[in-house]
């Protein structure tokens, strides 16, 4: 069976991907950082799923995480860089520490994980990397300059890696979700969520399972000729 490693897999879109890949018969490993209770509950529901605590912003912890995965599964066939933090605020209010943290997790975490994964994929001549960006990485957003910039950087990374590693059989793609019904958006009021839904051509908020379904498709043989692409899962919001 193929193996997938999903970072930030204990909640939201990450947890939906853990469930979807597990249901499709994959070996599944996922990382978490603060959500230990949620991670344990998720792993308990699916025998054989491996959960590993790691801060992806720390390259040493990333290396240890990959070692823990390889101790159970011989190879990683697909890496999903999903771990992320949100950093809201006016541009002039963001501190140096704010900028460093949002890029450390959202961008450099993906860099560290991708480096570890490619070292395993390259000798085998195949592999699949999926980066989870955001609609804000495509459109930008007021009071989201830190988060949006880090997610835009993921898009540039994905396209560059697709060109660099395509000749070695490694595919790299990106998903840019819109407003999805997850804990990350639970901070918004019902009125705010309704207002957002009204801006979306399909007229509703997205579901984490819809993002997970696309991730699984991009891992499938049917998607073997797809690389370097950014897929919006946003109900058409990106075209408004």
Please place each PLM-identified region on the residue numbering.
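Active-site helix of classical SDR
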Residues: 114, 150, 158
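Short C-terminal tail/terminal secondary-structure segment
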Residues: 139, 216, 227-240
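Conserved glycine-rich cofactor-binding loop
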Residues: 10-11
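Alpha-helical segment proximal to the catalytic Tyr-Lys
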Residues: 119, 163-167, 224
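Conserved glycine-rich Rossmann-like NAD(P)H-binding loop of the short-chain dehydrogenase/reductase
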Residues: 24-40
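Residue(s) in the substrate-gating loop at a strand-loop-helix junction
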Residues: 134
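Substrate-binding pocket helix/loop in short-chain dehydrogenase/reductase
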Residues: 90-91, 98-103, 185, 192, ...
């Amino acid at each position: 069976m193929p193996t997938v490693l999903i970072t930030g897999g204990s909640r939201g879109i990450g947890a939906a991907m853990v469930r979807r890949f597990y249901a499709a018969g994959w070996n599944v490993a996922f990382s978490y950082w603060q959500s230990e209770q949620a991670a344990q509950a998720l792993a308990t529901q699916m025998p054989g799923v491996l959960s590993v605590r790691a801060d992806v912003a720390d390259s040493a912890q990333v290396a240890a995480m990959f070692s823990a995965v390889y101790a159970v599964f011989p190879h990683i066939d697909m890496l999903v860089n999903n771990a992320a933090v949100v950093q809201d605020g006016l541009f002039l209010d963001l501190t140096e520490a704010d900028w460093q943290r949002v890029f450390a997790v959202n961008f450099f975490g993906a860099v560290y994980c991708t480096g570890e994964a490619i070292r395993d994929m390259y000798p085998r001549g195949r592999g699949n990397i999926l980066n989870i960006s955001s609609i804000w990485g495509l459109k930008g957003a007021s009071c989201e300059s830190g988060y949006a910039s880090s997610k835009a950087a993921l898009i540039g990374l994905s396209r560059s890696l697709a060109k660099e590693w395509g000749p070695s059989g490694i595919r790299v793609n990106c998903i840019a979700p819109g407003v999805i019904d997850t804990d990350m958006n639970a901070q918004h009021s019902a009125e705010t969520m309704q207002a957002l839904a009204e801006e979306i051509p399909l007229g509703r908020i997205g579901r984490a399972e819809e993002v997970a379904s696309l991730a699984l498709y991009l891992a499938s043989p049917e998607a073997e000729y797809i690389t370097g692409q950014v897929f919006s899962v946003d109900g058409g919001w990106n075209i408004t």
